Amino acid sequence: MKFVIESLTKNSGRLGRLHIKDGAPGQRTPLLMQTTKGGSIPYLSADVFESHVTETPQLLELTLSTIDHMSEALAQWNSADRGLSDYIGFPGHLNVLLLRDPCETTPAGGNDRDIQPLFTRRGKESLSAQRYMEMVASLRPDIYQGLCDADTNAESAKKRVQKSVDRTEKFMHYIYEHKSKVDSTLLAPIVGGYNTFARTQSIKHALEQPSGSYGGYVFEGFHTNGLSATILDASKLLPIVEHCVGQLEEEKPRMVPGAYTPLTTLELIGLGMDLFDTSYAYCAAVNFKALTFTFVQDEVVHVPLLDITDDAIKEDFSPLLKNCDCLSCQKHTRAYVHHLYKTNELLGPILLMVHNLHHYMAFFEAIRESIARDGLPQLTELVRRQNGDSQVDYSIAPNRKVISKATMGKGFAAAAV
């Protein structure tokens, strides 16, 4: 993997191009990875995604907690002319393997000295560094993150934070020794919660490795995934990230998985982060929210989210978002999507997911254009206030309006918590 910085400014982050493997098109950064569950874009088939969301090859974010059961089959499937993306129905797309699903809350606890818990649909699995590398060798992703203990957040005690760093170093010592058996690019995990000393220790361990040991960094341990990322305190997060970035070399990409709000995402990009995912778009859709925040300068006051369960829109025949050219907004109305919610039709979350992904991908295109003209601060201020007088709230409240348990899973899903 090769990362080339094309533009670097003090106030607007950096533009780059990520070349993951020979023959594949380069990916422009800041990059939005497509979050998947079990190898699929939530609610969307590969055909729908490629025909109605984007035809451009994407970087798919796969999680071991949702595809661990595929490792045995993939050990027999993988060959020189086909791989993990082909197996899940996305040929031509690149992929990165993470441990935890950023869309769902990761349970706390279950940590052992030599074992990392992996919470799957079948329950908790015990994952040693050796077993992890065996699974990575079977799955053969294009990029994979190093095994780490990220069971920390803003409330974690100092002892828990230090244990997360020490256990991660132990896991990574084994992975660095055996990475030559895996023909994939490794991302070094940076953990340590909200403790600058612990984060520095984690960074030093990565920097001590021989040149070429890994291709980039993944920042973990700021939240427990799911909706927790949408409500974290950016005033605590940003100083820690700035502290870490100042110690890292410029020529390696930096990933921060999780459902960070659009505003926090912009602030992280301003500090030099490069790779994000679409878990925020999913968390909004699964909790009956359409993304309606603007990133185009105008004189209208906007709201960041549209609650499609609100009876006030039952006779509103306007699109989810004015001037949006996604399939959902071109062919359907707010009243119709509200009707789909009321009747628990499966088309409801499909239309919301199509819209949210389309809108969020357009948002990242606007981010790259803003960085190119050194205008990220202006975009950040627009997203912060939406032309209003005060900062808007991008947090996502859990869905509490499921019509009945008997219908859960048939249309709009239960809350992402």
From Swiss-Prot:
Which biological process terms from the Gene Ontology are attached to this UniProt entry? tRNA-guanine transglycosylation
List the Pfam families.
Answer: TGT
Gene Ontology MF terms in the entry: metal ion binding; tRNA-guanosine(34) queuine transglycosylase activity
Is NAD one of the keywords? no
Question: Cofactor note, please?
Answer: Binds 1 zinc ion per subunit.
Cofactor dependence is on: Zn(2+)
List residues binding Zn(2+). Answer: C324, C326, C329, H355
What is one term from the GO cellular component aspect held by the record?
A: cytoplasm
Quaternary structure note: Heterodimer of a catalytic subunit and an accessory subunit.
Q: Which NCBIfam families match?
A: tgt_general
Q: Of which family is this protein a member?
A: Belongs to the queuine tRNA-ribosyltransferase family. QTRT2 subfamily.
Listed name of the protein = Queuine tRNA-ribosyltransferase accessory subunit 2
